[in-house]
């Protein structure tokens, strides 16, 4: 191992090397941890197949490390991974009068809720290698455009900070504590997901000490406090039991003048650690339509169509191409239903001497993707039959 370390010191780090030579001294490729590398700096990000069976796996959510030629040094410490309430790995369980955190019984007094703003998380950290503060997403070390709109997240952060809050890069450099990572949420029209905000904004969410992971309270800030308080602030809510929590979640589904289609809440322990996400049902529905690539979106539209759920989606979520696809889908399905109803009547008027005669007639007269309905004796509504098989036949619809 010593020989290997000596070899690394004499070569330029790259992602392949860092999968073996990293702060945890393990083969990250075997643990489904991705390494994003830039010069001697790496960002660690869990892969979709990560089992989260090691304590440090939760840290692999955008934490940034730098190798100075002798040892690894943390550059940033954003959130650790936490899950939606319904997911099996979530550490929080809600009971009527108490909560379980990592299996330990706690009071509702030990937690609080904050709105989960529907934007892009930005970690602001000091890069000692280049000597400046860097606002970055949790997923990359490299500057990239926001959905190909011609502006990067770094540019958007500095632009909104200066124009909306009067906070310049030089002012941050003079006042912010380099021992901390500052976490923000950018919510703007150019990076909009589901929630519609009345104005572009940056929320200051929290700050974390890089060395020990401590979440700072407002009383622990120094010169940077006035600037942090200038950004949009996250509201905290306290509840006494599960019933109050669910009522709050239900109330938060409603739109207001400042925010439409809110996402839900983050549940935090009183020490500031995020332990669960609870999302509104409406948001989950809308997110399924809006997120993902065009093929995924079409699949969601098809599912909603057969569930009679398209009317529940606000019209502003559909562009012209989506609306045209919905019309083609309706036309195709309605035409198919009419055709099959006519074929059912035709079948009833015929006499088939053998099962083979019937099978030959079905094969010759019924579209292959739905002939199973006839081979099953045309039992029940044809539309219900289609609905039950929408997943199996979904490719038939999405390319209309």
Give the ranges of each region predicted by the language model.
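Core nucleotide-handling region used for phosphoryl-transfer chemistry
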Residues: 4-400
């Amino acid at each position: 191992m010593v020989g290997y370390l000596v070899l690394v010191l004499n070569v330029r780090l790259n992602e392949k090397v860092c999968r073996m030579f990293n702060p945890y001294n393990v083969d990250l490729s075997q643990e489904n941890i991705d390494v994003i590398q830039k010069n001697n700096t790496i960002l660690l990000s869990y892969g979709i197949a990560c089992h989260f069976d090691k304590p440090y796996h939760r840290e692999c959510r955008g934490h940034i490390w730098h190798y100075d030629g002798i040892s690894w040094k943390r550059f940033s410490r954003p959130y650790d991974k936490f899950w939606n309430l319904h997911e099996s790995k979530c550490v929080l369980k809600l009971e009527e009068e108490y909560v379980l955190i990592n299996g330990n019984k706690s009071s509702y007094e030990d937690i609080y809720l904050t709105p989960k703003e529907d934007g892009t998380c930005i970690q602001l950290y000091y890069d000692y290698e280049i000597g400046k503060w860097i606002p970055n997403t949790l997923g990359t070390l490299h500057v990239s455009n926001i959905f190909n709109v011609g502006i990067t997240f770094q540019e958007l952060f500095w632009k909104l900070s200066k124009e909306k809050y009067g906070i310049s890069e030089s002012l941050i450099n003079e006042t912010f504590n380099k021992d901390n990572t500052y976490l923000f949420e950018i919510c703007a029209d150019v990076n909009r997901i589901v929630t519609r905000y009345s104005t572009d904004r940056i929320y200051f969410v929290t700050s974390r000490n890089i060395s020990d992971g401590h979440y700072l309270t407002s009383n622990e800030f120094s010169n940077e406090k006035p600037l942090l308080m200038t950004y949009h602030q996250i509201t905290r809510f306290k509840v006494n039991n599960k019933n109050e929590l669910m009522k709050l979640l239900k109330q938060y589904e409603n739109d207001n003048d400042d925010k439409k289609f809110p996402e839900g809440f983050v549940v935090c322990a009183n020490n500031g650690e995020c332990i669960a996400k609870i999302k509104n049902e409406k948001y989950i529905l809308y997110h399924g339509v809006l997120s993902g690539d065009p093929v995924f979106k079409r699949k969601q539209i098809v599912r909603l169509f057969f569930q009679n759920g398209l009317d529940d989606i606000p019209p502003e979520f559909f562009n012209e191409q989506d609306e045209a696809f919905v019309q083609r889908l309706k036309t195709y399905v309605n035409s198919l239903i009419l055709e099959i109803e006519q074929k059912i009547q035709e079948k009833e008027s015929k006499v088939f001497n053998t099962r083979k005669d019937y099978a030959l007639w079905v094969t010759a007269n019924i579209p292959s993707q739905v002939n199973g309905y006839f081979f099953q004796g045309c039992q029940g509504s044809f539309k219900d039959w289609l609905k039950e098989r929408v997943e199996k036949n979904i490719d038939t619809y999405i390319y209309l």
